[in-house]
Amino acid sequence: MECNRYIRVLLKEPNKKPKIVTIENTLENMQELVNGPIEVIYHKGAFIICNEDGKSKKLEPNLFLEKDMILGSFFMVGDDYENADFISLNNRQIKEFKKEILEEMQREIEMEDDLECEME
């Protein structure tokens, strides 16, 4: 079995654009990135890793994705199904997920603008 000690992920912090980072593929490092215990969510052939306690700790809203709000920082990793491991995202996945996140961020901005206009 190939060891994926370092993996390339797409990190999304609240109020920031997503960025590509290389992380050590350890539980401790993942917990440090999301500031707590991790929750793993399957998403379009990859995984979203976020803080399991994000809602109970009332972390800062980050992104609305698939009918749920992700709170706090999260990152996306590839799925090595055969070896039950996380792997680097490939270039296609990075491009696709970055586009998806940026489009959702734009929708959220437009919704906020619409609400402000209605209140005036």
Where are these regions (language model features)?
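Non-Sec secretion/translocation targeting segments of pathogen effectors
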Residues: M111-E120
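N-terminal nucleophile
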Residues: E2-N15, K19-E112
